[in-house]
Amino acid sequence: MDSWSYGRSVFMSNETLLPCDTFAKNRRFEQRLSNNDDVLISDMAGNSNGFSAVSITKVVPEEEDEENISSSSKFSSQELNRIDFKLRSFLDLGNDDDDTSSRGFALPSKKSRASNLCSQNPLCQVYGCSKDLSSSKDYHKRHRVCEAHSKTSVVIVNGLEQRFCQQCSRFHFLSEFDDGKRSCRRRLAGHNERRRKPAFYFLPGKRHKLLRTSQDVVGNKFLENSSLVLPESFPGSLLYRVIDEDDHRTSRLVSFKDEPTCSMFPTNEQNSSRTYESKPAIYSTEVSSIWDLHETAASRSTRALSLLSAQSQQHLSKFPNTTFSITQPNQNLNHSSSTDYHQMEQPLWIDPGKTNSAGSSSCKGKGTSTVDLLQLSSHLQRIEQQRNYTGDVKQEYNELYFPGS
């Protein structure tokens, strides 16, 4: 305290500020601030009552100001990133804790399951067997059946009579198997369908067209499952298949054109009766479709008819007691789209010993019907007449079986 602050008048309190006091205080404040050059007293004004208002501003260089601002901004961004990182790590830790807690329930079950599999040796599941399969193949281990019971026709599994299917690799009821089969009926049907491909014959002249045999070709049967006959071996004519009736085996295919004598009538050395099955010329150089195939066979029928009539008289006189059969085409012709050109009926048995004065022989079948050679020739003539009925049908089936040709 200054000396003049003591001994004031009674009428004046110690708290009363005099102008001299304010001036002295202001001087001391200036001296205190003079030690700090950064502080500037910008405004000091006196009031009527002796008080003054002083505004103090701090003078800071611009470089330091920018560094402080950048440091404060960096600090704030670092703090924010740190806080954000802490929050994220906290959330991740929480999720990891949840995952580990959920995994903690799942992992022991897998370990226990694996330990159970390792601890227990695979055994055959057939009742009464219980064979240890640890030294068996992996296939038998996987399906829990021993090698012997995998091929057994009847076993008991789960109290029921079953059998092991080799394609399904599991046990089925006995009703699902055919007799003597090791695979179930359902799998075996699909297996046979894939394995049994339909047979095809190739007809030259139609740009590698394949023609299906047997029932698939307009329902006819004159293309049967026989061996391929090349056009070099048998150039177009009527073919006859010689069949031994004793053992029903096919011996050869002969032609009217090549061997008229040997193919039609047997010799003395041939003791067994033979069946001569009529076959059309399957392969020829001029054949281009199934209809051209028939026309080629029909055009050669007159030659076969002449050979038949010329040789019959000569050979029937030589062998009076020989019995043979010739398969003839059926005379009942159906002109609908579902029938073929000629169908084969039962072979006719011709007994050359029973001949009439006109030179024709009577033909007796396995029934009681008889047919002479004139009726036989009429059958061959009808083959030639069939071309009159092939106008619209030929065009329809050529479009059906040979499209775009």
Swiss-Prot record:
Binds 2 Zn(2+) ions per subunit. Keywords: DNA-binding, Metal-binding, Nucleus, Transcription, Transcription regulation, Zinc, Zinc-finger. Its cofactor is Zn(2+). Disulfide bonds: none annotated. The keyword Endoplasmic reticulum does not apply. SUPFAM superfamilies: SBT domain. Zn(2+) 2 binds at residues 165, 168, 172, 184. InterPro entries: SBP-like, SBP_dom, SBP_sf. A motif (Bipartite nuclear localization signal) lies at residues 181-197. One of its GO terms (molecular function) is transcription cis-regulatory region binding. It is found in: Nucleus. A zinc finger (SBP-type) spans 121-198. Zn(2+) 1 binds at residues 124, 129, 146, 149. Induction: Negatively regulated by microRNAs miR156 and miR157. GO terms for cellular component: nucleus. Pfam families: SBP. Trans-acting factor that binds specifically to the consensus nucleotide sequence 5'-TNCGTACAA-3'. The SBP-type zinc finger is required for the binding to DNA. This is Squamosa promoter-binding-like protein 6. The lineage of its organism: Eukaryota, Viridiplantae, Streptophyta, Embryophyta, Tracheophyta.
